[in-house]
Amino acid sequence: MFVSYKWLQEYVDLTGITAKQLADRITKAGIEVESVEVRNKGVQGVVIGHVLEREQHPNADKLSKCLVDIGEGEPVQIICGAPNVAKGQKVAVAKVGAVLPGNFKIKRAKLRGEESNGMICSLQELGVESKLVPKEYADGIFVFPSDAPVGADALELLYLDDEVLELSLTPNRADCLSMIGVAYEVAAILGRSVKLPTIELHENNENVHDYISVRVDAQEDNPLYAGRIVKNVKIGPSPLWMQARLMAAGIRPHNNVVDITNYILLEYGQPLHAFDYDRLGSNEIVVRRAKKGETIVTLDDVERTLTEEHLVITNGKEPVALAGVMGGANSEVCDETVNVFIEAAYFNGATIRQAVKDHGLRSESSTRFEKGIDPARTKEALDRAAALMAEYAGGEVVGGVVEANTLQLKDVVVTITLDRINRVLGTTITKEEVAGILTNLQFTFTEDNGTFTITVPSRRRDIAIEEDIIEEVARLYGYDHLPATLPIGEANPGKLTPYQAKRRKVRRYLEDAGLFQAITYSLTNEAKATMFALETAEPIRLALPMSEERSVLRQSLVPHLLEAASYNRARQVENVALYEIGSVYLANGENELPNEKERLAGVLTGVWHAHLWQGEKKAVDFYVVKGILDGLFALLGLENRVEYKQAKREHLHPGRTAEILLDHKTIGFVGQLHPNVQKQFDLKETYVFELDLEALLNVEVDDIRYTAIPRFPSITRDIALVVDEHVVAGELQKAIIEAGGELLKDVSIFDVYKGDRLPEGKKSIAFSLRYYDPERTLTDEEVTNVHEQVIKAVEQQFGATLRG
Amino acid sequence: MKERLQQLQQEALEKIEQANDLKALNDVRVAYLGKKGPITEVLRGMGALSPEERPIMGALVNDVREAIQQALEAKQATLEQAEVEKKLAAEAIDVTLPGRPIRRGNHHPLTRVIEEIEDLFIGMGYTIAEGPEVEQDYYNFEALNLPKGHPARDMQDSFYITEEILLRTHTSPVQARTMEKHQGRGPVKIICPGKVYRRDNDDATHSHQFTQIEGLVVDENIRMSDLKGTLREFARKMFGEDRDIRFRPSFFPFTEPSVEVDVSCFNCGGHGCNVCKGTGWIEILGAGMVHPNVLEMAGFDSKKYTGFAFGMGPERIAMLKYGIDDIRHFYQNDLRFLQQFNRV
């Protein structure tokens, strides 16, 4: 809402307060003033001139030579390029020495040999935005009314000496979508009174019912419809002050009738519509829901197809307006209009919102209906419009109002105690202070022993309950006066849940292990949604996606991590190690919330470790990633409960992929990207993993129990076992541990060999076994006994032989 | 004999002096103190001396041996030291060459901000509540005093999946769910961090996915002044001890009264700069007293219980704190961006 500071003074005395100060006060009290626009863009020395003579410039077709009276001394000669300049006009003249926007100084000049002592200005040249200039003056100079006083300051007449406050209104303050509403707010803030416009309505002795009747068939959509007839209007420009105020408020002037409806819309917040009575096509107005497929051509010359969800104003047969949004072209007021039917109605916001949405058509009117107008002022606004049309369009107001009124206006009464106000706010405001604030708001109230009974005026539709009153008191009392305290009451210790605490440790571990935390989007496309997923479900699609790329909820974190790796690689960041913790979404069926499961995933590619001058360089490989995961499982106390199983999974290298099992249940995978997928994402050799984080973090783990530090020496024996090449180390190791019994404490692999020195199809794996008894020193013999059992076991189970 | 001994001592000391390495020194030792050395020989000749002379001469021999021995030891220590120094000199390295790098990743900047905020509120007795990102319309809107048909819940602004299910547009549904779980009994003291979604085109200042942190306290006798005190405490811990806050009246459907909360500019201290656009204040939070409808819908008696709620955007805080100019950075995962947050 744009509020002209000059115009606002019609309703509230602003003596002693500048526009800037006013803006600060309004902002502090709750409505943000986004900007204060100074309308004068540096213009000086522009006055009203009277064009006494105009003739063709002798040397230029497109120039006129004018003799202009500017109210000082002899009339001056001015050369003017505007096509519409004519003898007898009152125009804006920038005198010699004047300044126009952009610090453009007007000097005495010779144009094609003719002297020019100033410049006749268009509105644009004075700094008015083109979209606000009346259409008839769009390409020429602005012509003032004939009574404009010669020599007067043109800026003042055009309100270009004004300042405009732009209010950013929250949806609850629709009351301030009108000058009167703003005046009430300002009056409350400043503690001053409001002057409402006086309406001098002179009706003739005809009866409006002889001209028109009104019927509303959709009363819920339209509880109040009122109208008046103004006869014998003469379409022409509206008074200059009205045009100037409309332009200040950001509305382009058209003609007197249309300008008056717009002026009332701004003044009262009540949208009006003026129909050409003679073009209505009947003597009745019927308000109803549109029929499916019915059409209307609106004022913007667009044909719109309607549905039963839209409300229309009809002449009993066909629509003449899309209610509350825009009038129809068929009944539009035009230059030939003589008799006007003015509509003032109260439409349901939701109904109007539907039409706005369906037709992508938002207007000053629809905005106000959507947010809610004050129905108690509807008829007053209608009267004021009729009175102005009589005054400024030479019309004659037909006696009476036609209306269909099922509106039930009930006073909103709120009762609240002083104690409650202070208890909620934590303040010690006095009874007198509350009374003062309510008085300034011009709320009617009674007070009895600290209990206030308040009747809320109909313009403040946002106030209905105690808390609303508390807010009014708080904002006008001033939040700066609110003390700062801390809650009193039982203090609970704050802490993370075990899951949250472990999740933080997982993050920190992975970061200390060299991975960076990524956060990627949850929405993806259909193809990527299920790629790599540990569990898959029906894809969950948005009803109205903004793009195909962000239309489905992900079931794995890996695809977007691959995109991130690819994004980096495309920017010459080749070495990437990222992890993400985030949700995947598994459908549970229509209208059920999906299962949201937290996953941990990672992507690693490029060089893992490089210390080049010492000759160290290591690319990421399967075992780098596995090592990181092993560390993670150890961190969580799960190292002995996790297994890796060779696996084949879609999109992964068939020979370099493992499924990860926790307590024999699959909880994730790690593997190298399949070359085809690698290519698809434009990556080099890349490894990925994804784990069910909830399974990892929710599993019960024993608390740490101290075990005695070894007091006796341990004995280490190494063996190299030759086995068939398909035998996997993990199985071999498991067998060794089993056979080694209690005395075998550690088994580690220190060599793997495959090659010329072994028969075809064989490999050798070397293990180091450490034996230890916490109670005593082991003898060589005892160890040998166990060790031989171990060797026997692997011989029997795997056909392993000792490598010579 | 005496002269002979003095001469031997003289000779030996000179040779010790001349010895350049441990081997040469050892040769001197063997030559003079060895069993076949000249001093032993002198000792053997002592039999020819008179009993009076013998102890005198014996003492003299010992003195000479002692002197040579001492000289040998001293020289040995010097030579050994020299040897060590030589070895160390040969072992010198260029300490300016780079060390073996330790690979280290780090938190995403949003996590950094979120964890810092979480910890501040945990310190004030809050717990962290989490909830689903795919939500029922009821918890996302209705339970928060946004009934059906309310303009703020337009299909155009939210990602709906069905008419009743959508991607949550704020973390407030977690508040509604948590209150419901409390079955009308306070106190409730939570903060809710999480991802939220809005139907916005991604650009420098908008992202269809972003994060929020909201806080909620419900108990008997919670006052708006408690909200102010709590947020002032938060602002000071988060942005510096000399920060102040101010409330500006505002509107949210789920709180009444509602306020926007500004923190005095941590860049200029409130004098006005480009971070605070010359105002000295930076808008950080939205807050207010929980609307009685919200309390009642969650099963709390709004006559007995009051509460406050607040919400903020980690993206905005991170952007202000670190001077980040484009919200898309948070979701591109460019390592050149992420790596900048790798220190205290």
UniProtKB/Swiss-Prot annotation, chain B:
Q: Which SUPFAM superfamilies match?
A: Class II aaRS and biotin synthetases, tRNA-binding arm
EC number from the UniProt entry: 6.1.1.20
The UniProt GO MF terms for this protein read: ATP binding; catalytic activity, acting on a protein; magnesium ion binding; phenylalanine-tRNA ligase activity; transferase activity; tRNA binding
What InterPro entries has UniProt attached to this entry?
aa-tRNA-synth_II (IPR006195), aa-tRNA-synth_II/BPL/LPL (IPR045864), Phe-tRNA-synth_IIc_asu (IPR004529), Phe-tRNA_ligase_II_N (IPR004188), Phe_tRNA_ligase_alpha1_bac (IPR022911), Phenylalanyl-tRNA_Synthase (IPR002319), tRNA-bd_arm (IPR010978)
Gene Ontology annotations of biological process type: phenylalanyl-tRNA aminoacylation
Primary location:
cytoplasm
Recorded catalytic reaction(s): these are: tRNA(Phe) + L-phenylalanine + ATP = L-phenylalanyl-tRNA(Phe) + AMP + diphosphate + H(+)
Name the record gives this protein: Phenylalanine--tRNA ligase alpha subunit
Q: What is the scientific name of the source organism? A: Anoxybacillus flavithermus (strain DSM 21510 / WK1)
